[in-house]
Amino acid sequence: MKYVSTRNGLAATSAETVFRGLAPDGGLYVPVLEKAWEPGSAVAKAMADESGNGERGTGGLADAERFVLSRLFDDIPESVREAAVERLLSRFPAEDPVPVVTRDDFEMLELFHGKTGAFKDVALSMLPVFMKHAAGGRRVLVLTATSGDTGSAAMQGFAGVDGTEIVVFYPATGTSKIQRLQMTTPPDANVHAVGIRGNFDDAQAAVKRIFADPAMNAEAASHGITLSSANSINTGRLVPQVAYYVLAGWKLASRSPQFDVVVPSGNFGNILAAYYAKLLGSPIRKLVVASNVNDVLARFTKTGVYDPGDRFTVTNSPSMDIRKSSNVERLLWMVSGGLGGDIAGACAETARMMGELERLGRYELSAKAKELLFEDFEGGEATPEETEAEMRRMHDAAGYLLDPHTAVASCVARKLGYPKDGVPCVIAATATAYKFPETCMRAFGEDVLTDPPPGFAELESLPIAQKKVCDVNEIDDAVRELF
């Protein structure tokens, strides 16, 4: 698989993309894929051949990961890929790590059975294996911005991994209490969490600026350190998530030749992974972006105009409180010629739009790119009030507890009329409700969280190990302290 930067087409191996995280020109690395799926195509047949009967039991997730990694990380040795899969399975004791359960007309793709109760646990169990391989013995300092879930999953993934150190930057007042405790209680010497007086966009902008700063990278190198990322800007985080949607297709294969998927979206990585799965042969018909009132992504899928504006609202779905979503850049590249093999044209268009975002605060897709966007994507939004109402509705209708992010997706799906035409509608259930007790109490007026997942109940009794808080303009110094 060939990877190039979205900005200038600079080529890299998959191992290099994992090690670097961000491309030297400030762009993101993208696999050069084609829009290949159609019923009966060679790639669809290959996927069907590997899916067995669609009910893979305990091996389902592992087989889906092997399928994806053999396509997208094919130049990483098979022994390394298999070690990553084995590490993943060792950290997911459930009989079926990613089940699909039917609730109230929807197919709930449960991605929250890892240690921190969020969809990021899968990929962040595997990333350290790829990172160590790519580093080749070099020391790596992993910088990560988080709106809540990535931070704790990354800290759990890298805890105790030789040759690596990780620091996560999170909004000091913009996460749930459980999310915050999951980041501030780990005592491992190589993991660090820093609260910032700002929001996720501030943290992400600072981290990306550090990656693109030659002086900062040279300073790190003088201490024998290479900087990398555990955010979904890193292919090693993004690629394992593709398997979720390969697996969903396998599990639904006996019921339907197609499915739609609705994903609560913040930084656009999870739904981009679903798009990659479609390009690899998963029979996804429509990809639905579900936003909260910070609805930049939903508006983008409706208009082809990306306009973050100045409005930012702290909501009850904090992991989606994002205005500038990094992974959209990868989609821009694909719909601007990348899917058709016009790498130079795609890079020129992407560089133009990202430049306009920097200078003008917005950009607009070309007419052709809009056509491709609208063909595959749809979007909708839900208010905090609608989110809590949907949590109550699903609990009353199906006895099923939604976390607020999944409730946004469920609400958007219903508002848009899914399921449609007899085609199953898959909702990406991205977190357990137990991560958001304050919202659950407000939604239900009583404590409905009676059976917490392992490790959650004792969080409040653990000592706080990570106490540092800083201003946004102090993030660079916080990184330097780890050199």
Predicted regions and their residues:
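PLP-dependent amino-acid enzyme catalytic core
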Residues: M1-F483
